[in-house]
Amino acid sequence: MKKIRAYATAAHFGPTMIVTTIAFTIALVLGSTAEALGIAFTVFLGQLIIGWSNDIYDYQDDLKHQRGKKPLVAGTITISELKRLTFIFIPIAIAANLLGPLGLKGGGVYLLGVGCGIAYNFYFKFSVLSPLPYAIACAALPASVFYGVARTPPLWILITGSLLGVAFHFLNVLKDLSQDRESNIGGLPQRLGKWFSILLSFLLVCVSLFFLFGQ
């Protein structure tokens, strides 16, 4: 049980469940409960890959900053164990998304979002373009659900998803901003600083609410 909790924590369980719940809610509104549960499960698998790849890549940096809440740093699981489980789950997640309830089109779009999450972990977090994978992935999520139930996603939901995704990106890095700079992680929030990031997040949320409730 302790290992399972450690793997869940390494997958960034809170954000993973938020994304999964959003997918389930959209699917439930558009289709049946069975479809929604199936879609939520496939989305959950993709989020596991993103979270685990993040902790694998950040392992040395987490050690440097003594982030003892991270399972790899705490020693609850080893990096070889996490890598092994990640590589086992990658083909499972790909197959479940392409052959499951999302279908080829919806599954392909969602996997694009998963790819963006992994690309952020390994590359974009160091770039001024760090918001880009968030913008794409958070538009891909609702789009994939719409395609999964044979519906065309409206433009407003794609824009709303992108804006909220970028806002989350700016807020999510605030807690580690100074440590990120020490580690030469130069994403856009790190370059703009704390208060500009908070202000930009607020503006993005306001604009996204306009698109959401203006329909």
Which stretches of residues belong to each language-model region?
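Multi-pass alpha-helical membrane architecture of UbiA-family
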Residues: 1-215
